[in-house]
Amino acid sequence: MAEMKSPTKAEPATPAEAAQSDRHSLLEHSREFLDFFWDIAKPDQETRLRATEKLLEYLRTRPNDSEMKYALKRLITGLGVGREAARPCYSLALAQLLQSFEDIPLCDILDQIQEKYSLQAMNKAMMRPSLFANLFGVLALFQSGRLVKDKEALMKSVQLLKILSQHPNHLQGQPIKALVDILSEVPESMFQEILPKVLKGNMKVILRSPKYLELFLLAKQRVPTKLESLMGSVDLFSEDNIPSLVNILKVAANSVKKEHKLPNVALDLLRLALKESRFELFWKKVLEEGLLKNPSWTSSYMCFRLLGASLPLLSEEQLQLVMRGDLIRHFGENMVISKPQNLFKIIPEISTYVGTFLEGCQDDPKRQLTMMVAFTTITNQGLPVMPTFWRVTRFLNAEALQSYVAWLRDMFLQPDLNSLVDFSTANQKRAQDASLNVPERAVFRLRKWIIHRLVSLVDHLHLEKDEAVVEQIARFCLFHAFFKTKKATPQIPETKQHFSFPLDDRNRGVFVSAFFSLLQTLSVKFRQTPDLAENGKPWTYRLVQLADMLLNHNRNVTSVTSLTTQQRQAWDQMMSTLKELEARSSETRAIAFQHLLLLVGLHIFKSPAESCDVLGDIQTCIKKSMEQNPRRSRSRAKASQEPVWVEVMVEILLSLLAQPSNLMRQVVRSVFGHICPHLTPRCLQLILAVLSPVTNEDEDDNVVVTDDADEKQLQHGEDEDSDNEDNKNSESDMDSEDGEESEEEDRDKDVDPGFRQQLMEVLKAGNALGGVDNEEEEELGDEAMMALDQNLASLFKEQKMRIQARNEEKNKLQKEKKLRRDFQIRALDLIEVLVTKQPEHPLILELLEPLLNVIQHSMRSKGSTKQEQDLLHKTARIFMHHLCRARRYCHEVGPCAEALHAQVERLVQQAGSQADASVALYYFNASLYLLRVLKGNTNKRHQDGHKLHGADTEDSEDQAANCLDLDFVTRVYSASLESLLTKRNSSLTVPMFLSLFSRYPVICKNLLPVLAQHVAGPSRPRHQAQACLMLQKTLSARELRVCFEDPEWEQLITQLLGKATQTLQTLGEAQSKGEHQKELSILELLNTLLRTVNHEKLSVDLTAPLGVLQSKQQKLQQSLQQGNHSSGSNRLYDLYWQAMRMLGVQRPKSEKKNAKDIPSDTQSPVSTKRKKKGFLPETKKRKKLKSEGTTPEKNAASQQDAVTEGAMPAATGKDQPPSTGKKKRKRVKASTPSQVNGITGAKSPAPSNPTLSPSTPAKTPKLQKKKEKLSQVNGATPVSPIEPESKKHHQEALSTKEVIRKSPHPQSALPKKRARLSLVSRSPSLLQSGVKKRRVASRRVQTP
């Protein structure tokens, strides 16, 4: 070791080494420098920007002329590269470089660009790259910000762009566009000087291209005097120029169809028209009569964008002209007939334009109102085309919002159809249906839209709610939904509102649905600042007060649906109850009841009969629940045989849930959350009866599920009215096709036997069935044929009616089933509230089996509709997440402990009898939940007792036995475990029992004998593997170890070792996949047992396992070599040697390594690894590597000579080492180890020859060469690869570490070597193979 450490000091660097180090540093910088240009051309924008920043930073920190010249040359070359996507990247990098280094002359750069990509000397192949290189070069000069300051470079650039504009096939209008961008930033004096050179005085040339027109407009804007002196007085909007302007705008629209933006030339023309007071002429002649005469979608969208962009520029009169012209009608028609994908593109753009306009005139409410009214009045046969929910309303100030609501209200009351910008589509015009053009239909469509727009103003999330506006809308909706005016009175402003068209039932029905939508908005959207007005009362309470006031003014107002005396008494009683609840408003329960009472009270105007009964029941329940002594009231209810108030309330909530109202659903959840602490078993049974699959399938429910058919028919009629009439023909065709298909399906069905019999009888009665012998009979007469036809017609008519009745019955049943499933999903809300808010309620335990029945039935159901899936998912989520995994659970289970144990047994048995393992998992988890309930109460008492009295473990176990019957539970789970380990197909799984064992180690302790019995018993291999797996997972658990005393634990480990040893007798004889899995499992179990023995230092006799394993070594080795079960044989072999290592037997080296290190007499000199690559010819083999009869001493001496010779440059083929691969030979040929360090072979210090043991294997020349090179690179003397056995492993690991640690520059040693290699060999592919050389260097660092 001393001899190895002595050469670690590096020798003084020679002058040649110092020069090479400098060149190495320069080369490293060059690599980093050159990598920037590769990253600049990458498609990722962040990578490009990062590379450009690093390049600029590199050039700033290293001001080197050669690198700056190379950078400019490389960037200029990149302007015309073949990859078109990379050209803008190089242009941007060049612009930033010129911006950072202002001392670089722009004219020189421009000259270099024109020299590199000469337009005069370019051939056909280089034409396109050269043109783009010059264009991007000029753009780079302009983007640097220095071009407008350098007059000479500017003139050259303008001239170059003018030349490039002569190649429109490649560059299109990009040169003129670049020229316009440049001239828009130059000073006015320079613009006047450049203008004559770029703009000719011919208007035909200007009106030929949008870019030239844009240049003309720019000149007219900046230097109008110079332009007039150059071209004279020009009227751009003359009659002669109108067609040219239209064509130019069409070309401009097509040029930006992919960018989806407004062309600049269109907006410039608009500004010029406004400046010259020619806006009306431009709008009508150019846009409406020109572009929209035969519009394409590009021209139409350009006009729409121009409309939006012009809004902030127009006056009040001009806005009226624009918003009531042909263009706005074309916009509305496009909104109606466009496909959804196109509609979704234009609506956000128009919304952005309108939002910008409204935001810009916040201080002008009149202008905001004009814009909102203008877009509202764009109608298609009375229906506005804009959506009712429009986000731009958030920009309205309070005054404009108030005025807009007033305008909507007035338009609803007295629709002014003449003020609308109405239109009809082409299909609507062709239909010529008189019923579609009547004013009543247009009024209905307009009023329906206005109602939803009013509600959306309140519903909008981003709108700052003004209480006056909210109250105005709410009062308007409530009054006209449920009341009518008899006589106007100043006390009720709504009575002064008169209708020019009577309010029909359809509009009133829309009003009713919109009113309850408004209630939901006021209840949900304002929850952050609860739905309270300034006086602290909810909006629903204020609306109820308003309704009560209207009912009291029966001389002036009457309700649409007249209330009977009983219904009016129910209303008055509700108002008195509300006052009582208001006095107790501090209680959350009172608030919930108040909310329910208000909502049901408002429903009395919609359905008086039903709401009246519900109101009475609710008030009775509220009064009973608010009594001071609820126990006394319950006993009084029992004595009088009346239902408990909470039961009545649950029935009411279930009936309210049957209504398809989300608002009612939320209110029911809220109210039930307050009454669930008072639930009785009868209440729970009412809810579970709704969920029971058997009850729902076999019996009619007590709760009638309503679907509000009238409302749905109304909504359906509204949808039909809102749809486009041009789709009616296609819909009728589809209906006829569907009818034909259904008739064909009916005919294809199996014929009813009864109908077949009737048909045969009719035919026999008419003598239409002739036998074989009746061929000569005469044909039927006309009267007989007519009678037969009538009989057949009546028979088929009856059959058709029967089929139709069956179909109607089937549809009815499907509809009822759908309503029932929807009702069950809603009823699950109550279960979810109960489980989440009252997890410790004793009634929770009664939910397990009903929920399991729902899950089981839903998973077995064949018709897996969406509702079935929703019901299953919601039930499973409540069961698993809210029930089984709840942190809190019931603690009062003492009286029902016996029933709970029976339920555990029943659940486990049901889990084992399921056909689906996924269903069995739910049953098994339910049993685990019950175990936790039983065990949790025990633990709680045990902890209290432990704290107070310091009871020992045995006493606590006795106490546990009194509460949790461990023997009973053990028998139950033992039977299920036996079922798992004996049945061929069992629904139980291993993870189920692993979960049981991890949660309840005491039960696991009792079940261990069952597992041990099946490890070595006459079980199936798969069952033995399962038993081994469960044992392996559980024995390593710390919780299980605590349950055992030390002698008991040692006895268990000894017993399991004996079982495992007995099973090991069959190791290596696997013939099937199950047997092979058993072998893996038993070895994993054995490793776990041995690890436990070693870790806890148990006194266990390991002789038997060792003997069995040693006897199986040869068989396993043969199995591995033969490749039997190749997917797991290596794993099996590794597990085997892990066990042997824990038994004290080290794993020998593999035969592959031995054959490589110690070649036998019969083996080829080439290693097994190199044999796979091919054999060497005899002439290439190294002589005397190992001859026959060679002694170990001679072999070692010959290899020592080989080490010495390896330090000298190889000259002849006979001295070459054996083949080590193509790449290795190339590296050796390029540079020998002695040349790497800059010294000759004579200067290389001779290695020492330590004493060699005869039994020491010699290293192969490949390993020797790796060792030698690594040591020479670091300046150390190469160590002989022949070492004693005791030092070999330590030497291999230590050689690299010590040399690198003692080297003066440990991290730079290998890069220096790589650089010196490159400098010596002068490889031209240095930069391209950087990654390859880094990989080679990393391999050289590794220890051989």
UniProtKB/Swiss-Prot annotation:
Effect after changing residue 249 to A: Reduced nuclear export
Biased composition, class Acidic residues, residue ranges: 732-747
Domain of life: Eukaryota
GO biological processes: cellular response to glucose starvation; chromatin remodeling; circadian regulation of gene expression; intrinsic apoptotic signaling pathway by p53 class mediator; negative regulation of DNA-templated transcription; positive regulation of anoikis; positive regulation of transcription by RNA polymerase I; positive regulation of transcription by RNA polymerase II
Cross-link type Glycyl lysine isopeptide (Lys-Gly) (interchain with G-Cter in SUMO2), residue numbers: 1149
Modified residues (Citrulline): 1322
Residues where N-acetylalanine is found: 2
Compositional bias per record (Basic and acidic residues), positions renumbered to this chain: 1148-1159
Bias (Low complexity) ranges: 7-19, 1317-1329
UniProt region (Interaction with MYB), positions on chain: 2-580
UniProtKB keywords: Acetylation, Activator, Biological rhythms, Citrullination, Cytoplasm, Isopeptide bond, Nucleus, Phosphoprotein, Repressor, Ribosome biogenesis, Transcription, Transcription regulation, Ubl conjugation
Comp. bias regions, Polar residues: 1188-1202, 1249-1258
Consequence when changing residue 272 to A: Reduced nuclear export
A Gene Ontology term for the protein's cellular component: nucleus
Required for nuclear and nucleolar localization, as annotated region: 1152-1344
Pfam family, one: DNA_pol_phi
Intervals of motif Nuclear export signal 2: 261-279
Main localization, broad class: nucleus
InterPro entries: ARM-type_fold, DNA_pol_V/MYBBP1A
Cellular compartment(s): Nucleus; Nucleus, Nucleolus; Cytoplasm
Family membership noted in the UniProt record: Belongs to the MYBBP1A family.
Function, as annotated: May activate or repress transcription via interactions with sequence specific DNA-binding proteins. Repression may be mediated at least in part by histone deacetylase activity (HDAC activity). Acts as a corepressor and in concert with CRY1, represses the transcription of the core circadian clock component PER2. Preferentially binds to dimethylated histone H3 'Lys-9' (H3K9me2) on the PER2 promoter. Has a role in rRNA biogenesis together with PWP1.
Annotated protein name in UniProt: Myb-binding protein 1A
Species per Swiss-Prot/TrEMBL record: Mus musculus
